[in-house]
């Protein structure tokens, strides 16, 4: 049994030992929390288009930015859901909702940032989900599934709550294929 270093601490793993450079770990952490904020803004923007009140903004932002990780952590069933044990995730999701509530995002630049930001965040979160599954000793296919669920689960929950068909089921957004690819790369 090896040790995986994750977020500055050692975590048991089945077959290997990974040491993470502090700079890489910092960049990864910054990217992760930036993704939570961005997905909170995207969710809040979608709530604005539907005319939701502030409670709707908060819920849609939370589903968008935290739902996939929550699904992953519940399915892995090893400890507290990360978004609940690390409050900065909730703060960033709610901050994204507030930003979207008071700042109007629209136009081609926003559409571009939203589509490409979603794809980049999805890839990052796929890697996060796959690595977390590996950390807990899950087999290959469940590791890939946890990567995909982490990357796409939040947008699926958001879309279902909003009464829409989940965009990952044919909206031509590049999220599932990069999620599978990055999950495979990190296994």
Residue ranges and their predicted role:
Residues 10, 185-187:
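Conserved small/polar residues in nucleotide/adenosyl-binding loops
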Residues 18-25, 76-82, 129-142:
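Helix-coil boundary and interhelical linker segments in multi-pass alpha-helical membrane proteins
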Residues 25-36, 81-94, 139-151:
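Structural signature of hydrophobic alpha-helical transmembrane segments
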Residues 29-42, 60-63:
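The first (N-terminal) embedded transmembrane alpha-helix
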Residues 40-50, 73, 98-111, 156-166:
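C-terminal ends of transmembrane helices
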Residues 55-61, 86-90, 111-121, 146, ...:
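Cytoplasmic-side transmembrane-helix entry/capping segments in multi-pass membrane proteins
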Residues 59-63, 70-76, 145, 149, ...:
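Short, structured motif recognition centered on aromatic/hydrophobic residues
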Residues 61-67, 118-131, 149, 174-184:
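Small-residue-rich segments of transmembrane alpha-helices in multi-pass membrane proteins
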């Amino acid at each position: 049994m090896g040790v995986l270093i994750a977020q500055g601490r050692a975590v048991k793993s089945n077959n290997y030992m990974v040491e993470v450079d502090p700079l890489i770990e910092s960049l990864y952490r910054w990217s992760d929390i930036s993704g939570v904020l961005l997905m909170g803004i995207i969710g809040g923007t979608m709530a604005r288009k539907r005319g939701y009140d502030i409670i709707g903004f908060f819920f849609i932002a939370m589903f968008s930015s935290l739902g996939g990780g929550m699904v992953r952590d519940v399915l892995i069933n090893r400890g507290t859901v990360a978004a609940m044990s690390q409050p900065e995730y909730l703060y960033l999701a709610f901050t994204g909702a507030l930003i979207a509530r008071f700042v109007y995002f629209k136009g081609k630049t926003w559409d571009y940032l939203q589509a490409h930001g979603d794809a980049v965040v999805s890839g990052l979160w796929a890697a996060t989900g796959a690595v977390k599954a590996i950390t807990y000793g899950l087999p290959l296919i469940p590791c890939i599934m946890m990567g995909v669920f982490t990357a796409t689960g939040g947008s699926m929950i958001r879309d279902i709550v909003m009464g829409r068909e989940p965009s990952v089921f044919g909206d031509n957004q590049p999220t599932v294929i990069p999620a599978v690819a990055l999950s495979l790369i990190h296994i």
